[in-house]
């Protein structure tokens, strides 16, 4: 209920537009790193032969339910090497869990290692250090039968001198007249935009910015094209 599949339709359509623009029409091969439950990917599998990676077996089971034809691997996107090439690499929400520049660099190197020359890499950080003026609060209420869920997301940066931030989720669950409250705390990365572009360049990508919207909110995707010679 927190992140239903249909909530990804708008954004996934814009990822699909970029892939169509960048790739030669064919049954191209794509790899999603950190696929999670596979909601975003589920809107792309009709046009692409997809493979997906995640560290969590539970997430992979959820992904399998809505993406039954996708090849799945349990592994860390910073280190995995599948030994073959793809036409495009995608990293959606999972990129936020990279906590250091070394994490980012290793992940970008993974993307480059799995791409054909001229292949496409798409990712999109939620926040940049330069433009995050927290705390930020988002909330939403959803209902399903007798169950009502309200969740509140509180994002803040306790120490602007480091590369991490915290996101706290509070869930207010009402069912049959009873209220249950649960909390979940996530530690995520927060980097200057220039660091993203610099590290992608170091991994061998030329980078362009593509603005998309999700729920009416503008959001930047970084689209990298793999060069034959890595940039220093």
Enumerate the predicted regions with their spans:
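SAM-dependent methyltransferase
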Residues: 125-194
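Class I SAM-dependent methyltransferase SAM/SAH-binding core
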Residues: 38-79
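A short acidic, Gly/Pro-enriched loop at the edge of an enzyme's catalytic core
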Residues: 78-89
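C-terminal lobe and adjacent flexible extensions of AdoMet/dcAdoMet transferase-like proteins
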Residues: 187-232
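Conserved class I S-adenosyl-L-methionine
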Residues: 1-36
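A short glycine-rich, Lys/Arg-flanked "PGG" loop and its adjoining helix->strand segment in the class I
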Residues: 105-117
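Conserved beta-strand signature within the Rossmann-like core of class I S-adenosyl-L-methionine
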Residues: 118-125
